[in-house]
Amino acid sequence: MKDWWEVFDKNNADSRYADYDDYINRTFGTGRASYDDGNEQFWQSLNQWLPHAQYIDIYGAEPTLIHRLFDILQHSIDSGYHKNQTLHFNTNCTIWNQTYIDILSQFKQVYFDLSIDGLYNHYDYIRNGETWDVVLANFNKYKEFANTYYQHPVSVCITVSMFNIYYIDEIFEYFENQLNTHFNMAHMPLHVSIKALPTQVKQRIREKLLQSKSEKFLREVAPILSYMDEELSIQQTNYHYPNGVWPEVVRSTTELDQLRKQSFKDTFPEFFAILEPYWN
């Protein structure tokens, strides 16, 4: 019987995917506490499952901040369990910890996903507090790692949201000749979902993305465009957004810009020009 671990990380609160009101009120601590260093029951349970675990799924944003996780993984190596264990390791590429990389490299196989959702100043905007220069330096280290440890595949995973949808062709084409590149969707909160965009804006996005010369990108983007055209859940929309989802997009983006001294308009001028008629 295959055991499935899922270990979630901390340090995702400052991205644009964090809920705005949670960010303001700092109400995301409960989820973090479940895998905090002090939650002995959690870590003891993982230790008990360790001898039987065959697949361990470690989600980002940045799991290298969960230091006790690597104590567990080192224990697996010391006990010999690692020889039969496959890991999936999702990182936002903001930290390179050589000690932890050395631990991961000893497992039977590790699938690395580098979660990078924008280029240059777009990245800095979406992942507030992190910088493109640091991510690029770490990305290059992961590329070197992939060339050394062929049994451990390294891929780039682009999470598609309303902040980067207009530019995903450019992001994909930047990475596709360096590492395998694929997409993931930002489903929640609803006001970062590409489903929330106005219909006319969706059409402009479609027209731009379908001009790509990359056959692989065109295959990958087809289900994204289909997803974008789906309707938002009426039940979720009415409950969480009594004034509508799009007004919340404008409100949360504008207020976070003021708080963080950022500018959606200046960072994404081409996209904002399309959105501006609806930005009120």
Predicted region positions:
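Generic intrinsically disordered, low-complexity segments enriched for polar/acidic and small residues
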Residues: 14-20, 25, 32, 39, ...
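Conserved C-terminal portion of the radical SAM core fold
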Residues: 109-113, 133-279
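Distinct, well-ordered alpha-helical segments
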Residues: 68-74, 98-104, 167-169
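Core AdoMet radical
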Residues: 1-39, 50-66, 79-98, 105-137, ...
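Short, well-ordered amphipathic alpha-helices
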Residues: 42-43, 69-77, 135-144
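An active-site-proximal structural segment forming one wall of the substrate-binding cleft
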Residues: 45-47
